[in-house]
């Protein structure tokens, strides 16, 4: 069984537990992530979970979804509009549709070859990478809803997948901005949610990043600015990376400003 299937399912269940407590009005409340609402976030996740699953099990459906999205964009319409068209529900019904499909997807992918190549919007990806990307999307977009509700997310060792994705996109974070990639990854010394020590990179070559793995994951997914974390960063290469990290595909995105994304000071 691919370990990432269990981790993806757990990520879905953690977010679903939070969403089950939302009332009708909260589903249309803007979050700190580009003012997206929980409805918009869940439509986005479900739309592209379907696409990822179809890329493996129904390639013609995947290609049709991709081409429809591109045609929508060529007409000058937003992806949020497109996602609302193809995922035409909201609130509790949307939660049920998203969670049921995502958990079913995790089950369907258990026995796949993790090295199998599958199509995506850009270059092909391995099954393992595709599933990790879906977990990362769930975790990163879910952060906006946890922040909106003033809650801390229960983390676990599943976070390592997102940390590794952040490490593996060190080069991408530079390339997407047209910068040369430094020859060496900074040394990372990260503390996992259960006190684990996760280390990457060579000592004494390109600086160092020390701190909580959760903070590192928030920086590479752009859910927090570096200054809103407790990460300790030494060296020019390490600091430039942490100020511009981007572990997801697409065009270069500007990370949030200091203080822009944070946990709301409220309960419920």
What are these regions (language model features)?
Residues 1-3, 50-111:
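Short, helix-capping/interhelical loops that line the mouth of catalytic, cofactor-
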Residues 20-31, 102-131:
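Acidic interhelical loop/turn segments
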Residues 11-18, 48, 101-104, 108-111, ...:
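Amphipathic, well-ordered alpha-helical segments in soluble domains
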Residues 1-43, 52:
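An N-terminal domain-cap segment
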Residues 29-72, 120-176, 216:
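Short, contiguous alpha-helical
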Residues 177-220:
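Glycine/small-residue-rich hydrophobic helix-like segments
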Residues 204-268:
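C-terminal interaction segments
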Residues 5-8, 95-98, 131-134:
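Hydrophobic packing residues in well-ordered alpha-helices of helical domains and bundles
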């Amino acid at each position: 069984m691919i370990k990432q299937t269990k981790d993806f399912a757990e990520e879905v269940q953690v977010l679903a537990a939070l969403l089950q407590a939302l009332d009708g009005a909260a589903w249309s409340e803007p979050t700190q992530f580009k003012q997206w609402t929980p409805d918009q976030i869940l439509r986005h996740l479900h739309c592209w979970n379907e696409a990822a699953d179809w890329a493996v099990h129904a390639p013609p459906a995947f290609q049709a979804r991709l081409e429809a999205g591109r045609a929508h964009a060529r007409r000058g319409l937003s992806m949020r509009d497109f996602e609302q068209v193809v995922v035409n529900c909201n609130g509790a019904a949307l939660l049920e549709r998203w969670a049921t499909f995502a958990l079913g997807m995790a089950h369907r992918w258990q026995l796949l070859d993790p090295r199998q190549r599958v199509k995506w919007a850009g270059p092909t990806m391995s099954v393992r990478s595709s599933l990790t990307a879906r977990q990362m999307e769930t975790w990163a977009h879910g952060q906006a809803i946890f922040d909106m509700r003033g809650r801390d997310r229960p983390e676990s060792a599943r976070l390592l997948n997102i940390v590794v994705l952040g490490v593996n996109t060190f080069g991408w974070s530079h390339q997407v901005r047209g910068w040369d990639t430094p020859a060496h990854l900074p040394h990372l010394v990260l503390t996992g949610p259960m006190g684990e020590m996760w280390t990457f990179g060579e000592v004494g070559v390109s600086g160092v990043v020390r701190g909580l793995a959760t903070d590192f994951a928030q920086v590479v997914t752009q859910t927090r600015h570096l200054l809103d974390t407790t990460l300790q960063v030494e060296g020019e290469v390490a600091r430039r990376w942490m100020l511009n990290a981007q572990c997801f595909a697409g065009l270069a995105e500007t990370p949030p400003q200091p203080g822009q994304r944070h946990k709301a000071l409220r309960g419920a």
